[in-house]
């Protein structure tokens, strides 16, 4: 009898990259549905534009690099990059913005480094930050939730706003906001920071229509709960590990609680931090990117906690209302250092 000795690894994970990406895309459905419910069909249209751009640009670069196009596109990583960017930008942003951001994310932030598995920074967040720095006005032009919107644009108006900048009746973004008192910026985090800088107290800010008596903001807390539900699905399917989301949310919640207890008249409450902006999207769908996150369990805890601290610092003292994208990229920079000091010790090695 002949015994064959196989080389390591002796255990195999049968899940392919494409299957994991499909699970993530499936988990994103609740967040997309709820975000569309509160903010309109623009969310879906931005996703379609981002997906088409991601596939087209990735295919073009792969052709230039003389690599297999179909096999690479089937891993769905480009599609996920486009989706994460699309749900992060205002639903009525001009069409060319999501195209530009997605192309930059795929070509510069991903393929320039060698493709999937080689990029040190999260591509979607690179694309988002490029757009935010280059076009700050358009990137902060969110309409308030449809619950308090002065007028709800029809699907045809949404199409025209994205592709022409005007509705069929000639209205623009300013006219869609008309009649909503006290809203200069439509997201709760935008409104909170802008109003505090204008000299209003926290109690006065929370009386604005964008909050509607809900500390995390009308619509936004349900959007975050939907992304949380998708994240729990990923944990149940073991598509992601618990270390990064838990440490991120604990760190953000702890910092927000301490800050709020110390200065309740100038800092946001823990509830607002946890259920506003891109908190849950970042915790479960962005920070958990296996390529750009730490690879050890202790490292993941440190990585997530660091990102949570950075989000709180940027939101509370920085120039941008939501610091998730910047926090992710800054935490990505530290990954090699974190992995170096948290790598398992080899048995017998001093």
UniProtKB/Swiss-Prot annotation:
Its cofactor is FMN. Keywords: Cell inner membrane, Cell membrane, Electron transport, Flavoprotein, FMN, Membrane, Phosphoprotein, Translocase, Transmembrane, Transmembrane helix, Transport. The modification FMN phosphoryl threonine is found at residue 187. The keyword Chloroplast does not apply. It is a multi-pass membrane protein. NCBIfam families: PRK00816.1, rnfD. This is Ion-translocating oxidoreductase complex subunit D. The gene is rnfD.
């Amino acid at each position: 009898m002949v015994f064959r000795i196989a080389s390591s690894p002796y255990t195999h994970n049968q899940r392919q990259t494409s299957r994991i990406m499909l699970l993530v895309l499936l988990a994103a459905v609740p967040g997309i549905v709820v975000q569309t419910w509160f903010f309109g069909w623009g969310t879906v249209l931005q996703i379609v534009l981002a997906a088409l751009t991601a596939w087209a640009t990735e295919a073009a670069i792969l052709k230039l690099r003389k690599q297999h196009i179909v096999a690479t596109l089937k891993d769905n990583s480009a599609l996920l990059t486009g989706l994460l960017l699309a749900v992060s930008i205002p639903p009525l942003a001009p069409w060319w913005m999501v195209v530009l951001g997605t192309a930059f994310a795929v070509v510069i932030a991903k393929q320039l480094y060698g493709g999937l598995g080689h990029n040190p920074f999260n591509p979607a967040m690179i694309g988002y930050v490029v757009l935010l720095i280059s076009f700050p006005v358009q990137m902060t032009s969110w309409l308030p939730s449809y619950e308090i919107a002065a007028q709800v644009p029809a699907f045809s108006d949404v199409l025209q706003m994205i592709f022409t900048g005007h509705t069929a009746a000639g209205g623009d973004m300013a006219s869609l906001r008309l009649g909503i008192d006290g809203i200069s910026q439509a997201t709760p985090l935008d409104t909170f920071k802008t109003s505090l800088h204008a000299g209003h107290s926290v109690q006065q800010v929370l009386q604005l229509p964008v909050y509607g008596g809900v500390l995390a903001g009308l619509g936004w807390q349900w959007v975050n709960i939907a992304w949380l539900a998708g994240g729990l699905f990923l944990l149940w399917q073991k598509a992601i590990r618990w270390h990064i989301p838990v440490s991120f949310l604990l760190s953000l919640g702890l910092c927000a609680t301490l800050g709020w207890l110390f200065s309740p008249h100038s800092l946001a409450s823990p509830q607002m931090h946890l259920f506003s902006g891109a908190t849950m999207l970042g915790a479960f769908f962005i920070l958990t990117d296996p390529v750009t996150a730490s690879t050890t369990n202790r490292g993941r805890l440190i990585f997530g906690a660091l990102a949570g601290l950075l989000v709180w610092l940027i939101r509370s003292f920085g120039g941008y209302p939501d610091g998730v994208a910047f926090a992710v990229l800054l935490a990505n920079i530290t990954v090699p250092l974190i992995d170096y000091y948290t790598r398992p010790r080899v048995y017998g090695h001093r």
